[in-house]
């Protein structure tokens, strides 16, 4: 019997490409749950590069018009899969503190959770995949699906970024090496501890990200063209994707311009007021300027978001 492999695909085509080459080298049945906006749907419906046995689109038929929520069903899901649904919900960048376009009610959150749980479990029960291949989840629905699969008999293969810049890790858990509980007892074989630390400094994620943003994010002309394309497009995402609820064009433009102005004001203040020389002998408290909307301080650290 052929292995059944379920892929989670999004706007990053890494896993679509993986599915394409995997199918050439391994005789298996490939399925896909696809998390994209409306416009790219046509590509996945017509493409012939990957022979998917069946595909599903994440946001299809997820609505906010459900007045009732089946709390007993959600309780059953928590007990069966060992989940704390509120912990996942409250640490999502869209549902809680960081999404300024729409405020979800308690009933909204539970209704969306119930709909996604039923949808995902029906897919999993229908195909019973042997493997689930995905990138590290970033949003609530992807994390919920991952948790449901992880706590079943299906083998997860999560592509994530370790602390070494330019490197990737495939494991069952995000950023954790399989079968290793702690790194303290792992012997150094090919490199000494000091050599590994030097390697870590050379392969810094910060350097990789800085180079990327310098190449991709500094063109004011591209920024203007992107804004004009956005204003001219007939987008309906705010009607079909909960991650876009309330994101009208006027609100998005205002939020973007407001963010640019605030950044300039704060940057000017920091350059003018904050000391630039570090006094090593003076007692200090280290307070990093955290990026709250990233997974590493939300889903990965659910009790440290304040």
Task: Annotate each language-model stretch with its function.
Residues 267-281:
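Short amphipathic alpha-helices and their capping/turn segments at secondary-structure boundaries
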Residues 4, 130-131, 283-284:
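Structural motif
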Residues 21, 25, 31-120, 163-264:
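Conserved N-terminal ligand/cofactor-binding loop architecture of enzyme catalytic domains
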Residues 279-306:
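Active-site donor-nucleotide binding/catalytic segment of nucleotide-sugar enzymes
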Residues 119-180:
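Conserved nucleotide-sugar donor-interacting segment of glycosyltransferase catalytic cores
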Residues 1-12, 34-36, 105, 133, ...:
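Nucleotide-activated donor-dependent transferases that construct or modify glycoconjugates
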Residues 14-17, 40-41, 140-143:
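Short, well-ordered alpha-helical microsegments
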Residues 7-17, 134-136, 295-302:
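A short, glycine/small-residue-rich beta-strand->loop->alpha-helix junction that serves as a flexible
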